Amino acid sequence: MSMSENTLCKAAFSDILLDGDITPCCYIKRNSNTSKIKDVDNLNDWFFNNKELISLRENLSTNIKDNKCNVCWKAEAEKKWTLRTSQEYKLQPPKAKLLHITGGRLCNLACRMCGPSFSSMIQVENRPWQNDNSLDHNYNWIDDQDNVAKIVQFINNQDIEQMQLQGGEPQLMKGFVDIITQIDSKKRSQLGLHVTTNASIFNEKFWEQAVKFWRVTAGISIDATGSRYDVIRYDGDWKTTEKNCVNILDYLWTNRIDPGPNPALNLNIVFQLANVDQCGVMNSFYEDLQKRFPGLAFQYTMLPITDMGASNKAWDIQNLPLEILNSLPDIKEDTQLVKQWRQGIDYAIENNGYNENYKQQVLTREEYFLNVYGKNLWTERPDWFEIYNR
């Protein structure tokens, strides 16, 4: 039975997400009963005995769509990527295999589609459509040595297979370096490490510790190249990011554990208005990296922009003007990336939700970006401004 025909989810049975809270994944609905890492002494005990998690597993294993997972159910109905369907899973007893740590909000970029929960730059910027005064000031919980000790103890005493680090920007966070340094050397040689980074910097001391793990995957987040990149990932510079991307991959390859599995790149692409016309460019960028680093393993993830926050619906490709969608170039390459890109556009055309509300949101936000950063999407596509401004 395929994942589209059942309600099973790998995350509920084998994953732990730490982001100050403790949950199976970042998409799950939270409430007042959601556990906090500061209140939990033993992560292994939480994994097996938390009542809400036990209830979730019971529902998912009996084909009941638990409402805590509505983000995935809705996205799947719209034929979009979901964490659940991206990972094949057959029912088996719970066993903690993946530890996913979102260490805080410390970041050096202010990406247009991101929010204050994941970027200290955006928190300071205080965008009017994202105002969230509930965020505490201690945004790097991972730097608390009590939390570091809990995590290191858990990893050293359990059979975790994979650890994922995410920010903010992990290369900037001291707590992450503390964790990957303090894990037993034998454990490191058995444990996969996935680091999600914007590649705006290259912290060699961070990667010096990272390459000691069994297999390292650099999850590099790039949605466009050149000047288009610069109006998506504000405060970033494409030439710097491109250079750092190459430096990271080169370092992973040169310093890999040999013999052992080859390091990997996972290219993270947030699919949105600002890059909907960049299919050919991104396909070429991805293929060029494969040619440059033939020994690396390669994969990509195309994330719908609504994964970055509910306030992003106006930038979802399903909610763009049909005139823009129908005018996009037909890319001839027959790669999997191109096919998925094309399928997303086709679905957006068939299920278009563009309306006056989304139009006004886009116009207002682009004006905001122009005022704050001196550039916006209309700098790149003045013809799109004409369409939105009618």
Report each predicted region and the residues it spans:
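Distinct, well-ordered alpha-helical segments
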Residues: G175-Q182, E204-A210, Q278-M282
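Leucine-rich repeat
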Residues: K150-N156, I180-K186, Q209-V211
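Conserved C-terminal portion of the radical SAM core fold
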Residues: H194, F213-G219, K239-N389
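Core AdoMet radical
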Residues: A96-L106, S117-D146, Q158-K174, K186-N203, ...
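A Trp-anchored, charged/polar loop motif used as the substrate-binding/catalytic surface
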Residues: Y89-K90, D144-Q153, S200
